[in-house]
Amino acid sequence: MKLAINGFGRIGRNVFKIAFERGIDIVAINDLTDPKTLAHLLKYDSTFGVYNKKVESRDGAIVVDGREIKIIAERDPKNLPWAKLGIDVVIESTGVFSSATSDKGGYLDHVNHAGAKKVILTVPAKDEIKTIVLGVNDHDINSDLKAVSNASCTTNCLAPLAKVLHESFGIEQGLMTTVHAYTNDQRILDLPHSDLRRARAAALSIIPTSTGAAKAVGLVLPELKGKLNGTSMRVPVPTGSIVDLTVQLKKKDVTKEEINSVLRKASETPELKGILGYTEDPIVSSDIKGNSHSSIVDGLETMVLENGFAKILSWYDNEFGYSTRVVDLAQKLVK
């Protein structure tokens, strides 16, 4: 597989490291930043530490352990040389091109104009597109798909959890809160932002904000469409988040032990192994930094009241876990 990455930010760099480790041929990176800066940010990471590879830069390229990766700086995806480079999959990780087409360019330009075979969005799409959450609706992957969304990191955490709960006990309705690490779509000091809460200093407050993650579960689990909603609390950590899911279950006499047993067993199935994790260790968010699971159930925090009213908490590394799924999806798309 020949891979290209469009946008070399937090997700783009993590995708690079995971793909590089698997021996995937990363042909090119498109980013408006110069190669020297891109190489430095790949090597030195405040969250995950120093990259254990030799990283250098040269004119128009970065070199990682002797392998040269072409650096392009093109604003319009229509003009990217994907056909010439023989690109199989583009990872669209700028966060900018979430519509198929627009005056500034769209994600389909990678395929329809630039000549790549397929494109994966690392954000929820703003229009109709196949959304895939691995472990949940992998069966929807087929060779005809040209563009897919890997959904959001929070949907990747929530959907496997909701799937297991719904199949085992039936979900009537539910509400989710993600206690989420801050991201680049917040200000580090008070500055204007279209979301006035995200305008406030990210490391100094708990910041309530919106998320479409719960509603998006309906895209990958149609039977739960309209049954889940949620919100987000951004907190002062750079990575490591947790979903707090409260559900009304159809099974009214369910117990904490039943829920935990079902989730633990599900985490060991071929379908969900490596995607859904389970722990009863008293962990904190820093303990799941660099964890490649989409969702790690915290069995100690499961609660049940009468009449099937339950709360389940599940951790996720919103950067590394999500980026791992992006690479998994790319490999599945070209099989």
From Swiss-Prot:
GO terms for biological process: glucose metabolic process; glycolytic process. GO terms for cellular component: cytosol. The record marks 180 as: Activates thiol group during catalysis. It is an enzyme of class 1 (oxidoreductase). GO terms for molecular function: glyceraldehyde-3-phosphate dehydrogenase (NAD+) (phosphorylating) activity; NAD binding; NADP binding. It is found in: Cytoplasm. The active site is at 153 (nucleophile). InterPro entries: GlycerAld/Erythrose_P_DH (IPR020831), GlycerAld_3-P_DH_AS (IPR020830), GlycerAld_3-P_DH_cat (IPR020829), GlycerAld_3-P_DH_NAD(P)-bd (IPR020828), Glyceraldehyde-3-P_DH_1 (IPR006424), NAD(P)-bd_dom_sf (IPR036291). Pfam families: Gp_dh_C (PF02800), Gp_dh_N (PF00044). Keywords: Cytoplasm, Glycolysis, NAD, Nucleotide-binding, Oxidoreductase. Pathway: Carbohydrate degradation; glycolysis; pyruvate from D-glyceraldehyde 3-phosphate: step 1/5. D-glyceraldehyde 3-phosphate binds at residues 152-154, 183, 198, 211-212, 234. NAD(+) binds at residues 10-11, 31, 75, 122, 184, 318. Catalyzes the oxidative phosphorylation of glyceraldehyde 3-phosphate (G3P) to 1,3-bisphosphoglycerate (BPG) using the cofactor NAD. The first reaction step involves the formation of a hemiacetal intermediate between G3P and a cysteine residue, and this hemiacetal intermediate is then oxidized to a thioester, with concomitant reduction of NAD to NADH. The reduced NADH is then exchanged with the second NAD, and the thioester is attacked by a nucleophilic inorganic phosphate to produce BPG. Belongs to the glyceraldehyde-3-phosphate dehydrogenase family. This is Glyceraldehyde-3-phosphate dehydrogenase. It comes from Borreliella burgdorferi (strain ATCC 35210 / DSM 4680 / CIP 102532 / B31). The gene is gap.
